[in-house]
């Protein structure tokens, strides 16, 4: 938004960049944001959740969204992929490519991102149980295209605990599942410094029927569990915590939501 230097309300009243006293945006403890100019200076990534049919179908959709002005990609996978099953598995009948894109193999992932410069676009992948496998495929595609893994920018949802609590798309028991999460955190911390290895998600918990307070409580508890698991695996919290992201719901009870955030 470099071209827009002055902001006004619909009534023409100028809007200042910062109001009130106390900690300022971009300064410790960052309760008002991590960037000094916030979204006036650093506009958020515009990405539409997309995925359907075959990898080729979704690749065409990705390109259409980027041509329309999207600045990032957000990948929706079908139910068999989310559950770690191949499209020809008998339990996949009726679900292949229905609620997202079907990705069974590395060749599918190559087709999914064909002719897209992964060094210039950030990619969000909404995947949990098989997140480590899909990340490995993504890295392989990028490196085949000449992009170093250290240059990749994006996010894995990779929040398996909320699956037991809300969405129910889990594959393994909790302890080995959290081990997989911490393994991904360790890999990205060492190899992919621009990658967010977990999107700790309250959204699904709220949609499953929780209150705002419960959404916040479960999400923070899950986040603490991931931090402890990574520390127990030998990682230093300051090395990985800055790359942890969060995904919350926003309901219509204005003041309650302000209090939550």
Language-model segment annotations:
Residues 1-257:
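Catalytic alpha/beta active-site cores
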């Amino acid at each position: 938004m470099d071209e827009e230097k002055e902001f006004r309300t619909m009534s023409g009243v100028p809007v200042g960049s910062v109001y009130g006293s106390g900690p300022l945006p971009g300064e410790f403890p960052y309760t008002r944001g991590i960037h000094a100019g916030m979204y006036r200076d650093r506009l958020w990534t515009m990405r539409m959740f997309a995925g359907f049919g075959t990898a080729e179908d979704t690749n065409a959709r990705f390109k259409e969204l980027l041509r329309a002005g999207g600045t990032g990609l957000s990948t929706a996978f079908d139910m068999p992929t989310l559950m770690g099953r191949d499209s020809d598995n008998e339990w996949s009948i009726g679900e292949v490519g229905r609620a997202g894109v079907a990705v069974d193999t590395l060749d599918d992932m190559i087709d999914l991102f064909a002719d897209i410069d992964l060094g210039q676009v950030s990619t969000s992948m909404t995947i949990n149980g098989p997140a480590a496998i899909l990340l490995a495929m993504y890295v392989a595609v990028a490196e085949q295209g000449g992009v170093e893994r250290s240059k990749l920018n994006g996010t894995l949802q990779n929040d398996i605990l909320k699956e037991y609590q809300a969405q129910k798309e889990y594959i393994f028991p909790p302890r080995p599942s959290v081990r997989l999460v911490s393994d991904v955190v360790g890999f990205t911390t060492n190899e992919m410094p621009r990658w967010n290895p977990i999107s700790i998600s309250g959204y699904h918990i709220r949609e499953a029927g929780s209150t705002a307070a419960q959404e916040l409580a479960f999400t923070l508890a899950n986040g603490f569990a991931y931090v402890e698991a990574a520390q127990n695996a030998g990682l230093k919290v300051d090395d990985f915590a800055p790359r942890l992201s969060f995904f919350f719901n926003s309901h219509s009870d204005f003041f309650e939501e302000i209090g939550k955030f």
